[in-house]
UniProtKB/Swiss-Prot annotation:
Native organism: Hydra vulgaris (Hydra)
GO terms, biological process: protein processing
Biased composition regions of type Basic and acidic residues, renumbered to the chain: 673-684
GO MF terms held by the record: serine-type endopeptidase activity
Residues cleaved off as propeptide: 30-152
Record's protein name: PC3-like endoprotease variant B
A GO CC term assigned to this protein in UniProt: Golgi membrane
A Pfam cross-reference name: P_proprotein
Residues with attached carbohydrate: 23, 62, 190, 698-699
C-alpha cells in the first residue's frame, strides 16, 4: 500500500453519463429591595444598600454578575414604566446622568450616561445603580458591561495562520500575492463547514490534539486493523502521523491560539485506522463503506505504489463499496470520496494506472506550488479533476510551508505530497456542502468543473473541450476556488438522474505495427431514442485488453467526436512487464459537457525508443514551459537578493529601522526625491544623519515589478 508493443485481444469502449441560537447574553439586573424604597435615604438606609450590594446578587438563571476591572462602561440601561421621556430626563438629571435617548425600538428603555464615573470606580457605580433603582418609575437600572466583540473579517488568529499562504496569500511565500484557495470570502459569509462530517481513511487520528479535539466525531471513527473504536495511531512509530496531518488541513479548529486553521474549521472530523497493518480487499471495502449514513466526505491519500511500473485497482468488494457509497451514502445523495492522485512524477508514473483515482465515484486531486506550477512529482492523467496547493516546487529544490497538526500534540509545517492537497479539497467541498446540503456526488464534481480556475496559464497543455471547458492533464480543470464553488452551489440545480450508454468497438483482434500506431474508429449514437440517451457526457470509461512484449512502451489516446484528445495511458520507462493488461478501465473527465454522438477515435501506439518518448512527455532537454517559468522566477529572486546585498554593503544604516519618535518625509537632493528622516518636534537626534536607508523598497525596479505583479 502506498500513501499517496501490442498484439491481439479485444478492445471495449464504454461511455458513461453520470449524469446526471439562541445567543443568551449574560448580564446583571440589580434587584430592588422594596424595603429601600424611600424618597430619601437615611443613614441606615444607605448602610442597607451597601450591605445589599456587597454580597453576591441573587439573579435569574440567565443572569450572573462579576464585578471586575475594565468590564463596565459609564452608561446604564434604565427601564421606566410607564414610558415617559420627560420622566427619564428628570431622573437622569437628579442623579448626575444624561439621558442619551431611547434604546432602539424597545418601549420604555432609556440609555443613561454618567460622565464622572470611570471604569475603575466600582463602588461609586454600584451606588448610582442602587439610587436609580429606588426611583418609583424605574423598573430596573443596569450598568452596561463592556462586551468583547471582534470583527468577523474571516481572518483566524491562530499563530501559524500567517504561514498558510494557500489559504490567504499576502505574498508571504515566493509566489505572487492573491493566488490562494479563496476561502476567506467564504468564512466571511459564516460558512465554515458546520454540520458536515469528514473522515480520514489512513493510519489513525490523534483526536486528542488540542487543535482537533473539539471537532472530533467518534461516530465517524473506527479501527479496522484491531476491531477497536479508538482511531489513535500507534505513536510509537513516528511515521503514523499521516492521518493526523490530513485531518488538520481539513478541519483544524480556528481562533483557539493553537497551530493553524482547517479549511472547514467547524466541520466534524473522524478517523478510520486501516493503513496500520495488512491491506485487503475486505478491509478497504469496510473502510470505504463505513457509516455512509453519517459521514459526508472520505479523505483518501493512499493507493498503489507510485513506482512507474505498477497497475493497481480496488478489489471487487472495494469497488462495490465505492459504487454503493455513491448510490446510497448521504441519504442517497452520494458519499464524496476525495483521492490524492499520487506522487510518481519522478518515475514517470501515470495516475490512470491507479484504479482508485480513475473510478468515476472518486474526485482525483493533484497539486501545484505557490507559483501555480506542477510539482516535480506530479502525475499526469485524464482522470484528474482539479488541483490544490502544496509546498512543492516544479523542480526539486525549495519547499514552501504547509501547516497542519502532528503527532504528540505538535504543529508541523512540513507536510508534503498530494497527501497535502487532497485534504484541502475535502475542506472546500465541506464548505460547499454546508452552502447546499442537497448536492449529489455528481453535482459536486460538476461544480468543480464549472468553477475551477486556470493555473500556470502560459502552459501549452491547456486546451478547451467541445463544451468550452478548459482542461490540462497536469491540472485537471484547474485550481479549486472555494468562493466560486460556494457561490455556484447556493443557486445550483441538481443534475438529472445518471444515465449510462455503452458503445462496443466492433472488432476482434488487431495488431499494432512496431514503432507505429493502430487507429480504431468507435461510432456511437449515444443510445439515441432510448432511456439511456445521453446529450452531455460526464465521464468516459475505456476498457482495454492487450498483450505486449513491454507494457511501458504503450501509449493510448482517445479523441472524441468534438476533437478533444485525452491521453488515457502514457509511456512508462520503468514498466518492463510483458503481461500487458486484461480489461483495464481507463477514464477521462475531459469530455465533460460534450455531446458524445459521433465517431470516437482510439489511437494505440508502440513507442520503442523510450528516451525520445520520455523527453516528449516530461520535457527533459526540451523547452518545458513550466521549467522556463521556474528559471525566470529563480533569476528574479537572485537578482533581487543581489540588489539587497549590494545596498546593505553600501549603506551601513540599511537594516536599521526607524527609531521611535522619528518622522519621515520626502526631500529633493540634487534633483532626486529621497526619504529623509528627522526627530519629531522636541525629540533628540542621537543617531546622526539617517537618510536613504530604505531606497530599495521604494526605488528598486525589481521590487516595483513584483509589487505590480501582485
Amino acid at each position: 500500500m502506498n500513501y499517496r508493443g501490442i498484439y491481439r485481444r479485444r478492445y471495449v469502449f464504454v461511455l458513461l453519463l453520470l449524469v446526471a441560537v439562541v445567543n443568551i447574553s449574560y448580564g446583571w439586573t440589580v434587584l430592588k429591595n422594596k424595603d429601600y424604597k424611600r424618597r430619601y435615604l437615611s443613614p441606615s438606609g444607605v448602610e442597607k444598600v451597601r450591605k445589599h450590594l456587597s454580597r453576591k446578587y441573587v439573579a435569574s438563571r440567565n443572569n450572573t454578575q462579576t464585578f471586575k476591572k475594565h468590564y463596565f462602561s459609564n452608561t446604564w440601561a434604565v427601564h421606566i414604566d410607564p414610558p415617559d421621556n420627560d420622566v427619564a430626563d428628570r431622573i437622569a438629571k437628579k442623579h448626575g446622568f444624561t439621558n442619551i435617548g431611547k434604546i432602539g425600538n424597545i418601549e420604555g428603555h432609556y440609555h443613561f450616561k454618567h460622565e464622572e464615573i470611570g471604569e475603575r470606580e466600582l463602588e461609586k457605580a454600584r451606588h448610582k445603580t442602587a439610587l436609580l433603582n429606588l426611583e418609583d418609575e424605574v423598573k430596573f437600572a443596569e450598568q452596561q458591561k463592556i462586551l468583547e466583540r471582534v470583527k468577523r473579517d474571516g481572518i483566524p488568529n491562530d499563530p501559524y495562520f500567517k504561514d498558510m499562504w494557500y489559504l490567504l496569500n499576502t505574498g508571504q511565500a515566493s509566489g505572487p500575492a492573491g493566488v490562494d484557495m479563496n476561502v476567506v470570502p467564504v468564512w466571511k459569509k459564516n460558512i465554515t463547514g458546520r454540520g458536515i462530517v469528514i473522515s480520514v481513511l489512513d493510519d489513525g487520528l490523534d483526536w486528542t490534539h488540542p487543535d482537533l479535539e473539539a471537532n472530533y466525531d467518534q461516530t465517524a471513527s473506527i479501527v479496522l486493523n484491531d476491531n477497536d473504536n479508538d482511531p489513535m495511531p500507534r505513536d510509537s512509530d513516528a511515521d503514523n502521523c499521516h492521518g493526523t496531518r490530513c485531518a488538520g488541513e481539513a478541519a483544524a479548529i480556528a481562533n483557539n491560539g493553537i497551530c493553524g486553521t482547517g479549511v472547514a474549521y467547524n466541520a466534524k472530523i473522524g478517523g478510520v485506522r486501516m493503513l496500520d497493518g495488512q491491506a485487503t480487499d475486505a478491509l478497504e471495502a469496510s473502510a470505504l463503506g463505513f457509516r455512509g449514513d453519517h459521514i459526508d466526505i472520505y479523505i483518501n491519500c493512499w493507493g498503489p505504489k507510485d513506482d512507474g511500473k505498477t497497475f493497481g485497482k480496488p478489489g471487487p468488494m472495494a469497488a462495490k463499496a465505492l459504487r454503493l457509497g455513491a448510490e446510497q451514502g448521504r441519504n442517497r445523495l452520494g458519499s464524496i470520496f476525495v483521492w490524492a492522485t499520487g506522487n510518481g512524477g519522478l518515475t514517470d508514473d501515470d495516475c490512470n494506472c491507479d484504479g482508485y483515482t480513475t473510478s468515476i465515484f472518486t474526485i482525483s486531486i493533484g497539486c501545484i506550488g505557490d507559483h501555480g506550477l506542477s510539482a516535480y512529482y506530479t502525475e499526469k492523467c485524464s482522470s484528474t479533476l482539479a488541483v490544490t496547493f502544496n509546498g512543492a516546487s516544479h523542480k526539486e529544490g525549495r519547499e514552501n510551508k504547509m501547516v497542519t497538526t502532528d503527532l504528540y500534540h505538535q504543529c508541523t509545517e512540513e507536510f508534503k505530497g498530494t497527501s497535502a492537497s487532497a485534504p484541502l479539497a475535502a475542506g472546500i467541498i465541506a464548505l460547499t456542502l454546508e452552502a447546499n446540503p442537497l448536492l449529489t456526488w455528481r453535482d459536486v464534481q460538476a461544480l468543480i468543473v464549472h468553477t475551477a480556475q486556470i493555473t500556470s496559464p502560459v502552459d501549452e497543455g491547456w486546451k478547451r473541450n467541445g463544451a468550452g471547458f478548459h482542461f490540462n492533464h497536469k491540472f485537471g480543470f484547474g485550481r479549486l476556488d472555494a468562493n466560486a464553488m460556494v457561490n455556484a452551489a447556493q443557486s445550483w440545480k441538481n443534475l438529472p438522474a445518471q444515465r449510462k450508454c455503452t458503445a462496443a468497438s466492433g472488432f476482434d483482434h488487431q495488431d499494432i505495427p512496431r514503432g507505429d500506431s493502430l487507429f480504431i474508429n468507435i461510432p456511437t449514437v449515444a443510445c439515441e431514442s432510448s432511456s439511456a440517451q445521453i446529450a452531455k457526457v460526464e465521464h468516459v470509461v475505456l476498457t482495454v485488453s492487450f498483450v505486449h512484449r513491454r507494457r511501458g512502451d504503450v501509449s493510448i489516446d482517445l479523441i472524441s467526436p468534438k476533437d478533444t484528445k485525452s491521453q488515457m495511458l502514457s509511456p512508462r520507462k520503468y514498466d518492463d512487464s510483458d503481461e500487458g493488461l486484461d480489461e483495464w478501465s481507463f477514464m477521462t473527465v475531459y469530455n465533460w459537457g460534450e455531446n458524445p454522438k459521433g465517431i470516437w477515435r482510439l489511437k494505440i501506439t508502440d513507442n520503442p525508443n523510450q528516451d525520445d518518448v520520455m523527453n516528449l512527455f516530461n520535457g527533459d532537454n526540451t523547452d518545458d514551459v513550466e521549467s522556463l517559468e521556474e528559471r525566470v522566477i529563480d533569476t528574479q529572486t537572485k537578482q533581487n537578493k543581489a540588489e539587497w546585498e549590494k545596498m546593505r554593503k553600501e549603506n551601513p544604516y540599511f537594516d536599521v529601522p526607524y527609531p521611535n519618535g522619528v518622522r519621515k518625509n520626502k526631500v529633493t537632493i540634487e534633483g532626486s526625491t529621497q526619504d529623509h528622516v528627522k526627530p519629531k518636534e522636541g525629540a533628540k537626534e542621537p543617531w546622526g544623519n539617517y537618510r536613504n536607508t530604505n531606497n530599495i523598497n521604494n526605488n528598486s525596479s525589481t521590487a516595483f515589478k513584483r509589487k505590480k505583479k501582485q
